[in-house]
């Protein structure tokens, strides 16, 4: 007789335990055990429990390679889902085998788990292991399907349990509730939350935290009448009362300094859309700025051409917004423009706007606004640029380049890499909750009753069109942060804390990824010969980039350096990139004139006519303002059940080498966090959005 000591760990989230019957089959290189029920006196498989069992076998099974967990009915009790963390088995020779699960078993089913050692296809020689990894991929591809979201955008998850089961009620003609309460500011897709596959949706704690925070705030907005007022704001200072209890050093600074040119320019470097600005070496023909116009703002002893040659002129071009139609909001037609803004980096270290044009087409009805124009002309011109920032940020930098692309990375990973693959183990922590938050996001933003339709001047179709244009211009190099800074010509720009912090995090990730990949891939041939890896890369190119060759995305990877860069890009996109554009949203937008989602008057065609009243009448009305800010408030408040970058409580790697690499990664991140906090002590306006302590492992909000 051979005795195997078994530990079974149940998840710690609420309702992770089960009352169903759980049995175990152990498979080794020398045989297979009988199915044996795991049962002892008292409660089995309670939430958070680690249960110990003894399994007797007729013979030694040799090296353990696979186990099967069988979930079956228990007596007359109803079906009860179970979340299994892992199974650990101590063999008769005292060798301990680890079998990671970290997934739900909802129904009566059998789950086969491999021993935790990471292996690429070439490492598997036993037919049973090759068959297992092939069957796992087949099952995932049968379950997870691609679905077209909007033509021209990355495809997304379409799984059977996304849709609710058939309705069972006496009156089939009664309309179903769509998750929207008339009069309230937002729509929540309850179905997407409730019926999403268990392994993709929020934990109970995160779900409860999300709705517990959102519900009372939405109710407060309703009771205060903020979402029913379709009129203009009477006074600018009234905007501060929207969130009287939600203040920070940054939000207070924004409200006090939003009119200053230096702060306007600062936001291009360290605001919530810091990846747009480019060094300008030649003034575009469509933006006919002359030396005579801007000479007073460049300082003595220089001129526009000299500053261009020195690399001190920068351009923010919102051409991606050109020609998109607007909609009516609250009975009033909204207006739109695609501005260009020229900036100068001066010897005092300030990035200053020196010229703004509110169109991509110059002409007599499109004046170039300058800092020495009237106070309200210049302020309104800057506000139009900030309006364009809203769409550049929300549609492209935030929703497209982090959420939607991250979801495509996630789905391709689930469909093409088995759990034993080292890249699956490396990247699965960075996919946590991405599908769930995107399901909610599609209901909040991209829905006929959502934010884009009810509070954005471009409406649902226009907002989607901006994203489609964004994807058509997206390149592989732009997602690889070091290349992006060089390509935009900002690699040596002083005071660019976003660049400094993002590079620090990128290189820490790159070092970690390098150690993991070189542990499992001995040479370039192993990379090129890994069919699962190549299918993953090809599917991302096809379903995320829609097969667009001009994107520069690889369709295959042939060398270890190529694989390292690619995996680092995926990891960064699904964590730090999102943190940089998401975490500061409320701080920079709670003062609405700094980030308006709509404009109620057309862009100025003549100078000298703007007044305080016309400025107020151009800004979004009270209702539109509050709908947008409520949604952004929700997106900036990470619900409970957080996992900061480098925090990997789920044990996927068991080998000593990768475990050391994980610990070294954590230490590097801790040092980066320390450096950021020390630097911020000397700054009037701290930049902390890329502090690793504040970065989530995944896109989970």
Curated annotation (Swiss-Prot):
Broad class of enzyme this protein falls into: oxidoreductase
Transmembrane segments: none
Top-rank taxon: Eukaryota
Keywords from the UniProt entry: Cytoplasm, Dioxygenase, Fatty acid metabolism, Iron, Lipid metabolism, Metal-binding, Oxidoreductase
Bound cofactor: record note: Binds 1 Fe cation per subunit.
Record pathway: Lipid metabolism; hydroperoxy eicosatetraenoic acid biosynthesis; Lipid metabolism; sphingolipid metabolism
Domain PLAT: 2-119
Binding-site positions, Fe cation: 398, 403, 578, 582, 701
Compartments reported by the entry: Cytoplasm; Cytoplasm, Perinuclear region
Impact noted for substituting residue 9 to V: In strain: C57BL/6 X SJL
EC numbers on record: 1.13.11.-
Tissue spec: Expressed in skin epidermis and other stratified epithelia including tongue and forestomach. Low levels of expression are found in trachea, brain and lung. Not expressed in intestine, liver, kidney, adipose tissue, muscle or hematopoietic cells.
Physiological role: Catalyzes the regio and stereo-specific incorporation of a single molecule of dioxygen into free and esterified polyunsaturated fatty acids generating lipid hydroperoxides that can be further reduced to the corresponding hydroxy species. Does not convert arachidonic acid to (12R)-hydroperoxyeicosatetraenoic acid/(12R)-HPETE. In the skin, acts upstream of ALOXE3 on the lineolate moiety of esterified omega-hydroxyacyl-sphingosine (EOS) ceramides to produce an epoxy-ketone derivative, a crucial step in the conjugation of omega-hydroxyceramide to membrane proteins.
The protein's name in its UniProt record: Arachidonate 12-lipoxygenase, 12R-type
